[in-house]
Amino acid sequence: MTYCYVCPHRCGVDRAETMNSPNGIFGSCGCGMQPIVARAALHMWEEPCISGTKGSGTVFFSGCNLHCAFCQNYEISCLNKGQEISVERLKEIYFDLIKQGAHNINLVTATHFTEAIIASLQEPLPVPVIYNTSGFETVDTIHRLKNKIQIWLPDLKYSDDLAAIKYSNAPNYFNTATTAIKTMYKQVGPYQIDENGLLKSGVIIRHLLLPNMLENTLRVIDWIADNFEPGQVLFSLMHQYIPCGRAAEYLSLIHISEPTRH
């Protein structure tokens, strides 16, 4: 890949140049082609069918194609803090986590490193691979990951496109994300859970309840109910919002979500 069109921003920049030159042109993600990893560890606080009893082998990639004002991982996703590594080292990280007992390998915000992800998964892993994403994906990128990802874990952040632009710089987010989610489902089909209650394959749609945006949430729920039958996808409604990142710049985002609304 010379010019990058891997995400819906379709920046068209030469990300190889950003790696090798301080004067390179940065796209929306602000990263070069080599993967940058901020943290890799067993994570016990994902959904129970993902974390299980031993943890999810979570790899947090630096940078992001969204820049959500309220991001809880702001230093990682927006300030790109982390260490640049090779594809070979990335594969080693997968197996280090598996040796520690990881039920799966959980790739967090990996879209801008799709080339490296594909290269690192040329040989199947002995555990499911999870693609943990903002939902702001292209159909082409999802197709390229076919047979490499067993579990899709997309956010469906917004049904309100004005809010998506305001808080995440994501034009046409709702149509883009819902099209992506339908494509993910076509790829892996209805979710499958093993005898230990762990997810083997399928789609979990996440949605974070944002302050003062209850209608946004209700429209997300309506879309899922209208487009999927019971037993096809899982839905994770989250209420752990706290003002992080640049949330203080927006009066509407400085409140903590009310558990009663959840």
Describe the residue ranges of each PLM region.
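Twin-arginine (Tat) signal peptide motif
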Residues: C64, K182, T260-R261
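Conserved AdoMet/S-adenosylmethionine-binding subsite of the radical SAM
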Residues: E92-L251
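Conserved small/polar residues in nucleotide/adenosyl-binding loops
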Residues: I254-H262
